[in-house]
C-alpha cells in the first residue's frame, strides 16, 4: 500500500482563521482528517462588518494554535506532512499575508513544498470533499465577495460565463440585514426572518434580469431595500421585507441560472450535466431548494458542499493543495499575496466598471 499525500491547509483570507489536514484513500477520494475554524464574529460585531486591521491581528494571535489543533485532531505527526498549502488570494491583503507567511515558514521549517492556493478554487472544488465529481461542470460561486458562473474544465482551468457587475450576493444579504437592524453577520438571519413574512408584500427590482446574459447585479436591489426599510415601523413589516428580498434573490438566480445552463451546454458536449453551487451563500436553504427544483426541471445533477464546508475553511484549501501536490505544481516562497486573483484571468473585470448592459 503506497503512502498517500498528507497536506496541511491554511486559510486566513478574511475573518476566519482555519487549518486542516487532508489526505486521500486508496481510491483517490479525499479524506478530511481535521478541519479547525476559528471565527471572528465577536471581534467585528460592534463595527457591523469586518475591520481588516482587527482581523489580521486576530489571525496573528490564533494561527499557531489553530494549526496545532488541526495537527493534533488529525492523529498525524508533523514529520508526516508532505506539503503546506496556504490561501494566497483573493481577499484582504493584511489577512492573506498572515496565513501565507505562516504557511511558507512552516513549509521551510519542515523542508517540504509550499503551495499557494486560490481561495475561489477552494470553493470551486469543495464538493469533491464529500462526493466524487467529474469535470467539466457548471459552478455558481456565491459568497460575501464573489458571485459568478464558471465553466469548470479542470484544476486551474476556468471559463467565466457571468459575474456581478457591482455587489456580491453575500454582501447584498449582509447589507440588507444591517438595514433591518440585524447584528453582523446578518446575512444568514435574513432566511430566518423570511420564514415569518409575506414574500409578496414588496415588489423589489430584479436588475438586468432580462439582459446581460449570465451577469448579475444587486446594487439596485439593495437601494430599493433601503428605501422600504426607512419606512418600516413594525416587526411584521421587517419580516415581510426579509421574505420579499429572499424571494427576489431566488427569482434572479432561477432566471440567470437557466441562461447559464444554455451557455454551459454550448461550450460542453458532455452527456453528464453537473451543476455545483458553492460559497457561503450556498448554505441558504431556500436557495438550495430552488436550485434542486431547477436542476430536476433541466435534467442537471445538482451538487452542494456540506453546510460546514460552504463558508471559508481550510479543508478546501488543503484539497486544492492535494490536487496540486499530485502534479508537482509547487510555489516559490516568494509567491505574493493577491488581493485580486480571478479564476479566469482572461475574463474582463466588470465589478465597479459602471458598464451598461
Model-derived segments and spans:
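Conserved phosphate-binding catalytic cores of ATP/NTP-utilizing and phosphoryl-transfer enzymes
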Residues: 1-5, 116-138, 320
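N-terminal beta-alpha supersecondary unit
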Residues: 5-80, 86-90, 119, 123
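Short beta-strand scaffold segments in enzyme catalytic cores
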Residues: 17-23, 139-141, 147-151
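A contiguous, well-structured pocket-lining segment that forms one wall/lid of small-molecule binding clefts
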Residues: 35, 77, 192-275, 282-298, ...
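Short Gly/Thr/Asp-enriched flexible loops that form oxyanion-binding sites at enzyme active sites
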Residues: 86-112, 285-293
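Conserved phosphate-binding/catalytic loops in two-lobed NTP-binding clefts
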Residues: 116-117, 274-275, 292-317
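Glycine-rich phosphate-binding/hydrolytic loop that grips phosphoryl groups
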Residues: 123, 305-345
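Glycine-rich phosphate-binding loop plus the immediately following alpha-helix
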Residues: 154-198, 222-233
Amino acid at each position: 500500500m503506497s503512502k498517500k499525500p498528507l497536506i496541511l491547509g491554511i486559510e486566513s483570507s478574511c475573518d476566519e482563521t482555519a487549518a486542516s489536514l487532508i489526505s486521500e484513500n486508496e481510491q483517490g477520494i479525499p479524506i478530511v482528517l481535521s478541519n479547525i475554524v476559528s471565527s471572528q464574529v465577536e471581534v467585528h460585531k460592534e463595527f457591523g462588518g469586518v475591520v481588516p486591521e482587527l482581523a489580521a491581528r486576530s489571525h496573528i494571535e490564533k494561527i499557531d494554535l489553530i494549526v496545532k489543533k488541526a495537527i493534533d485532531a488529525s492523529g498525524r505527526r508533523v514529520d508526516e506532512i508532505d506539503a503546506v498549502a496556504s490561501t494566497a488570494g483573493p481577499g484582504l491583503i493584511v489577512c492573506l499575508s498572515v496565513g501565507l507567511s505562516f504557511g511558507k515558514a512552516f513549509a521551510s521549517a519542515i523542508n517540504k513544498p509550499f503551495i499557494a492556493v486560490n481561495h475561489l478554487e477552494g470553493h470551486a472544488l469543495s464538493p469533491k470533499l464529500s462526493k466524487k465529481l467529474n469535470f467539466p461542470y457548471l459552478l455558481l460561486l456565491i459568497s460575501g465577495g464573489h458571485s459568478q458562473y464558471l465553466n469548470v474544465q479542470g484544476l486551474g482551468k476556468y471559463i467565466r460565463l457571468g459575474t456581478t457587475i457591482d455587489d456580491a450576493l453575500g454582501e447584498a444579504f449582509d447589507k440588507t440585514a444591517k438595514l433591518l437592524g440585524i447584528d453582523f453577520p446578518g446575512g444568514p438571519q435574513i432566511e430566518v426572518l423570511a420564514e415569518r413574512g409575506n414574500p409578496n408584500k414588496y415588489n423589489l427590482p430584479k436588475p438586468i434580469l432580462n439582459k446581460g446574459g449570465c451577469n448579475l447585479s444587486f446594487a439596485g436591489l439593495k437601494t430599493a431595500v433601503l428605501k422600504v426599510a426607512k419606512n418600516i415601523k413594525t416587526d411584521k413589516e421587517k419580516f415581510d421585507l426579509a421574505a420579499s428580498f429572499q424571494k427576489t434573490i431566488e427569482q434572479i438566480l432561477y432566471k440567470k441560472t437557466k441562461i447559464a445552463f444554455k451557455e454551459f451546454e454550448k461550450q460542453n458536449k458532455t452527456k453528464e450535466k453537473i451543476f455545483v453551487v458553492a460559497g457561503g451563500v450556498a448554505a441558504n436553504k431556500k436557495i438550495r431548494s430552488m436550485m434542486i427544483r431547477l436542476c430536476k426541471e433541466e435534467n442537471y445533477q445538482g451538487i452542494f458542499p456540506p453546510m460546514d464546508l460552504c463558508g471559508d475553511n481550510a479543508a478546501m484549501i488543503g484539497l486544492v493543495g492535494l490536487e496540486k501536490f499530485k502534479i508537482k505544481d509547487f510555489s516559490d516562497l516568494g509567491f505574493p499575496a493577491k488581493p485580486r486573483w480571478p479564476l479566469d484571468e482572461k475574463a474582463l473585470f466588470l465589478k465597479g466598471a459602471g458598464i451598461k448592459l
